[in-house]
């Protein structure tokens, strides 16, 4: 589970402006952190299919945001993919 300090750190690293908390970059970074956090959960609990459904929903939501960013600005998309080490 991400703590409030972890979220603030992720937001600070990815925000475009001082008060930016809702840009696609910030949202994708937060979703990526949650997805990576759940990966560790599934190593210990392989049969937790209820949480797996939630993971798939998070991955889908991140994919939609990445597709939106790709349509709007390809350079921002590529830099974000490289920064977060997301494969495409």
Curated annotation (Swiss-Prot):
InterPro entries: Ribosomal_uS15 (IPR000589), Ribosomal_uS15_bac-type (IPR005290), uS15_NS1_RNA-bd_sf (IPR009068). One of its GO terms (biological process) is translation. CDD domains: Ribosomal_S15p_S13e (cd00353). PROSITE patterns: RIBOSOMAL_S15. Belongs to the universal ribosomal protein uS15 family. HAMAP family: Ribosomal_uS15_B (MF_01343_B). Part of the 30S ribosomal subunit. Forms a bridge to the 50S subunit in the 70S ribosome, contacting the 23S rRNA. This is Small ribosomal subunit protein uS15. It comes from Francisella tularensis subsp. holarctica (strain LVS).
